[in-house]
Design a protein with these regions (language model features):
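Repeat-associated, polar segments at repeat-unit boundaries in modular proteins
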Residues: 309-330, 352-375
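Binuclear metal-ion centers of metallo-dependent hydrolases, dominated by the metallo-beta-lactamase
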Residues: 87, 95-141, 146-147, 155-159, ...
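Active-site environment of divalent metal-dependent phosphoester hydrolases
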Residues: 21, 42-43, 66-72, 95-98, ...
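Core dinuclear metal-dependent hydrolase active-site scaffold
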Residues: 1-56, 126-189, 252-281
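Active-site metal-binding motif and surrounding structural segment of the metallo-beta-lactamase
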Residues: 30-34, 42-90, 185-200, 212-214
Length: 375
């Protein structure tokens, strides 16, 4: 099984002083852990916390491009002796050939991180267009189209040269801050995409091409605040052509197994078919875990989903188990219960989950993870 964990933020994480926070992703097959970019500011702290909570101490680190808001968390991992990274993947800073001050500063800052990694004897591997990374079930083809000329906008010059990672067996394309034209250029028929540069690097014509070729879902690191200086057009274009959009207000989680992907976001589940056939390694629901979920032990919505996946449980299995218990005990499916009128039947829920849970299920019925979309 492969899991994708996109670290989310909350509104308080983004301040007027630090509106640019980048993004961070953890993708793993249970043995190999890839950390792609690392936020800055509070986002970097959230990434470090997530890694330690999951006891991921030897990840592969990736920097998609030379903008600090995407790699300060990576630098923090390198500096933290708790971690022993297996390697650092990035591009050669010398591939940024422009001589403007901004680009020179970007190169110097990235080189400093690379030197810190080398000082800790972490292997540094430079990637280029066509590079391949294979770690267990994780297969990545790298695409890069660094502009040869400086257009007068240093951000655009560096963004457009981001490393784009194509996870073909799960249908996932993440682009750093590059434009999504990489998908059309290389015929990458993604099912879910990460829109680059806070949403403004995906033009309508590319969104339409992606949707026409099976792309159903997208996300970006637009925090939807008035504090950012960027025009958020990617989200609007993706929505306009019929994609489902996920924000990073809260975590985004996805699991891939048995030829199927399930994405968890905002208390709901979404799905699509994929080529990856790795077996499911999540635990099925038990009365014990159902009781704890109903009592709110793992939080709500995206927090709950992350916590359950961290513990190795399937959120969908838990939802289905609770729905099944309710339906068997009451004969009512997807409906509200009247505890007084259904007391005898609800006692059967108590017998399954423990005394007092009939009333709790009544109050909480069918609002845990939403209705799973059928493939």
């Amino acid at each position: 099984m492969i899991r994708l964990h996109i670290i989310g933020l909350c509104a308080s994480d983004v301040t007027k002083q630090t509106p640019r926070c980048g993004d961070a992703q953890i993708i793993d097959d249970g043995k190999n852990y890839e950390v792609i970019d690392g936020y800055c500011g509070k986002g970097a702290n959230r990434l470090i916390s997530a890694l330690k909570k999951r006891k991921i101490y030897s990840p592969y680190l990736h920097i998609t491009h030379a903008h600090y808001d995407h790699y300060y968390g990576i630098r923090a991992i390198i500096r933290d002796k708790t971690f022993s990274p297996k390697a650092l993947y990035c591009y050669d800073p010398d591939s940024l050939r422009d001589v403007s001050k901004d680009v020179k500063d970007n190169k110097k800052a990235l080189l400093n991180v690379i030197n810190e990694a080398k000082a800790r004897k972490i292997p540094v591997i430079y990637l280029k267009n066509g590079s391949i990374i294979e770690h267990g079930d994780i297969n990545i083809v790298v695409y890069r189209n660094q502009p040869s000329k400086f257009s007068g906008n240093s951000d655009a010059y560096v963004n457009d040269g981001s490393l784009c990672y194509w996870f073909g067996n799960i249908g996932y394309l993440t682009t750093g801050d590059a434009g999504l034209d990489v998908a059309k250029r290389h015929k990458l028929f993604a099912k879910i995409i990460k829109i680059g540069h806070h949403g403004n690097n995906c033009v309508r014509v590319i969104s339409r091409w992606l949707k026409d070729h099976g792309c159903k879902y997208c996300w970006d690191n637009d925090y939807s605040t008035s504090l950012t200086d960027f025009l958020m057009t990617g989200r609007e274009d993706a929505l306009a052509v019929g994609m489902t959009y996920f924000s990073v207000h809260g975590d985004i989680n996805a699991i891939f197994r048995d030829g199927k992907a399930i994405i968890y976001k905002n208390g709901k589940a979404y799905s699509y078919l994929c080529d990856y056939v790795g077996k499911n390694t999540l635990n099925a629901a038990t009365p014990y875990i159902c009781r704890k979920v109903l009592r709110g032990s793992y939080g709500k919505a995206d927090v709950r989903t992350t916590n359950l996946l961290n513990l190795g449980y399937s959120p969908t299995s838990i939802q289905n188990k609770i729905n099944q218990i309710v339906e068997i005990a009451t004969g009512i499916k997807d409906g509200k219960l009247d505890y007084g009128k259904n007391k005898a039947r609800l006692q059967r829920i108590d017998a399954e989950l423990g005394k007092g849970y009939g009333q709790l299920v009544q109050d909480y019925i069918n609002v845990l993870f939403g209705v799973r979309e059928k493939v």
